[in-house]
Amino acid sequence: MNPQYLPNDGYIASTLTGDLFESLLEEGLRCENNKSVSTGLQTPDGVETCPHYGVSEENCEKLFAFLAPYIETYMEQFPYIKSIGILSSDCPITFGEPWFNLQKPNHYLPMHMHDGVLSYSIWLQLPASSEFIFSYATITGKSSDYRINLTPTDSGKFLLFPSTLNHAVHPFKSDDPNETRIVLSGNILFQGVAELINSNQINNFT
């Protein structure tokens, strides 16, 4: 007998540098002063399931420079991006504007996917116990959940994954109603023609 497993794409998990983690966390702790961002994830009565805020240009530059090599690594390890097949030739990849997610005990992120090609979630401040869930179809068409259990020791870690991979975050429990889970998320996209023509700095990911 020789069992065979069908191939699939996956995700990359790694850790921020200490300096970048401290810089992002510092801004995350005061990001309510930044512009509010709408993600479209709402409760049935039309309220966002948790607040979202923009990230400073300075931290965006640091973050994008850090993440760039991981995009190349993902493309080397998984066939997903090169198999998309909607373009006549390769094109550069660019970063969308990231955002902070602030979640208190009653907040959550329902099952959803992102725009773009790849997405990332960076855990900056975590409660005693929470989880991040991927959901995808098996080869038999059934729904399968992949759960990542998180504790404060996971602060500073991040995931890079396909944007169309469904994921969710359930509410966490805490005796402190003001305890806050801080996560930074963002998307990586194909660079549009207009942006490509007008830009003096074109990414070299192809």
Q: Model segments located where?
A:
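Non-heme Fe(II)/2-oxoglutarate
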Residues: 1-90, 106-109, 205
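Catalytic core of non-heme Fe(II) oxygenases with the double-stranded beta-helix
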Residues: 93-165, 170, 179-182, 194-197
